[in-house]
Design a protein with these regions (language model features):
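Local sequence-structure signature of Cys/Sec-based thiol-disulfide redox active-site neighborhoods
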Residues: 205-229
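Long, C-terminal-biased catalytic regions of enzyme "large/alpha" subunits
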Residues: 1-202
């Protein structure tokens, strides 16, 4: 969350990219720099570290410990999707694969046009390679889909199953391990009002040609091997 730590993370990732490039030339194999999901180890490692090193810093001090995955922001950092994107856009393009920005929403967007507008703004103004729109929803055995996190069905009062994305896929929150469950409780979601705030995002919108055509994105050097140049 701090500028110094973001710069340190950039230096570390660039160093790892350079080392991987050296290894590819040395061994003739291909290597990836990935932000692995760590849906189990982010809790397991934190739990064991707390036993052996009680003073170690983890997420959610004083309760169920867990680690924030890879170079993601702390889950409770902000409710402003563009503030989060500004930080992650410095880091996620440095991975060569296996990275994603999850746009966690408290509930689904009002319609497909709102979703399309958000997707377009991210695509046109940021370089990160992958991102998702990840609303939370609930399922009632009798009434089916319910928008947002609703522990009890508003129609019949029956207990529901709350679903959210755990790393790359949706699962019932009740089946998550203790660390991921704590992460879900700590998570700030990006509110619809902030996502739809045109004034907030206005200065991020680049000018786009109205004519139909193709856009080719290139990099100065090959991200996987410095021996190959465009």
């Amino acid at each position: 969350t701090h500028e110094e730590t973001q710069e340190f993370a950039v230096r570390v990732l660039n160093h790892m990219r350079e080392r991987l490039s050296d290894y590819q030339e040395q061994y003739g194999d291909l290597y990836n720099l990935e932000a692995t999901p760590a849906e189990s180890t982010s809790y397991r490692l934190a739990k064991h570290d707390k036993v052996h090193f009680p003073d170690i810093i983890t997420a959610h001090e004083g309760a169920t410990p867990y680690y924030t995955n890879s170079s993601h922001l702390p889950v409770g950092y902000t409710e402003d999707v563009f503030a989060a994107l500004d930080v992650q856009d410095k880091l996620q393009p440095l991975y060569t694969s296996g990275t994603v920005f999850h746009t966690f929403l408290g509930e689904k967007l009002p319609d497909w046009k709102a979703a399309a507008a958000l997707v377009r703004k991210i695509a046109e103004n940021y370089e990160l390679p992958y991102y998702t729109l990840s609303p939370t929803y609930s399922i009632c055995a009798d009434h089916g889909y319910l928008a947002g996190e609703q522990a009890v069905c508003p129609h019949c009062g029956r207990k529901t199953e709350v679903y959210s994305r755990i790393t790359g896929y949706y699962r019932p929150v009740q089946n998550w391990n203790d660390g991921k469950s704590q992460e879900f409780r700590d998570r700030k979601t990006y509110h619809i009002g902030e996502i739809k705030n045109e004034a907030k995002a206005e200065n991020k919108i680049s000018s786009v040609c109205d004519a139909d055509g193709y856009i080719l994105y290139t990099t100065a050097t090959c991200p996987n091997c410095r021996a190959v140049k465009p």
